[in-house]
Amino acid sequence: MGDAKVVRHDCRDIFRAFKMAFDPKKMFLGYAGLLASVAWCVVVVTFFSALKLISTTPDIFIKLIFYSAKEDISILINSLLSVIMPLDFGEIFVISILIFGLLAIWSFVGGAITRIAALDYARDESVCLADALKFARKKLWSYFWSPLVPVIGVFFFAVCNVVGGLIGRIPVLGEVVVALGFPFALISGFLMVFIGVIGALGLCFMFPTISAEGSDAFDAMSRAYSYVLSRPKQFLIYCMVNMLYGLACLSVIAFVAWLMIRLALFTVGLGMGQKLHMVQSFIAQKCNIACLGFCSATSMEAKTAIVSLDHWSLKFLAGMVLVYIFSIKLAVWSFAVTYLFSAKTIIYFLLRKEIDSTDVTDVYREEKQEEATAATSDTGVERPSSSEDKKEIYPSNEGAMPNS
């Protein structure tokens, strides 16, 4: 019989997220979610760029996987700024399509991951992948709408201020109305800041809330705001520990992946010689595939040299190397995703125990609900015990003479 897991019910439990993130079911879900996200972005951008609504090319999303973390951040920021800054209606529409699609993907994937993490941490139970996906499917709309509730709140108060500004277009009367009602605009501004900032901080608790409680989007939002506001110091401590430990774990995983890629290229290159060097140089012109944050800058000679592959077999080799390294790098990012969901689930349970005094092992179980439903008659009345059944079925036998 294996040793039971040590659960301390304090910030040290966050260190368990590293091992929890390596659950094959979570890694599969994270990998599938990233693949679906990249595919969704490529398809949407390709479609709308063909319609001339946007000028962004779909290869930017593939490069985000290939490049290192610091390269990813700069490329992503520059790409988003180039798309968002003009505020063209078509570009805003495309961004909205992308966001809603990604939210639907990660509502399903994130819901399943946090469900597995909740049962793993709270009750040390291993739920099968099919059950986790079934739970995420049932609660999909709750997962989907919970992050949107703060956005809707900010948008509502923003629209109120816009309407007030439209009234200000009326000559004389409108200016007087805006002058007298401007304090309400300031209050709306404060509410937008409050709802937006606290909602962004508590966003990490919304999926774990639904996975642990089996509740809806409103309960997820209320708990997210309550936990951040009730224990801000504890919340910040947990998040700081989570961030530092997560970065350290991701650095280790990224270093192992980088070293694996470099050793594979180096040892195969010893045997293959100049051919593999040409393939590496050709690929390096497109992206620095072996870089995971631990490589030096590309030399000027490598940047200026132009390498072309003449034979189809070398091009095939280059393409397959790209596919293999893309898969490895995607696995690194999938670990980051599964770690994030696992750690946030642990933090949710810790804060729930401190604020609501709820036992950590208290998790919503569908089996209990099904048993309660099965124990209830079709009319909604509880089934009586066996002795009561006899009294109801044979009321006229009481006091009757026994048969001779």
Map each language-model feature to its residues.
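Helix-coil boundary and N-terminal low-complexity module in membrane systems
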Residues: 1-178, 191, 196-205, 210-247, ...
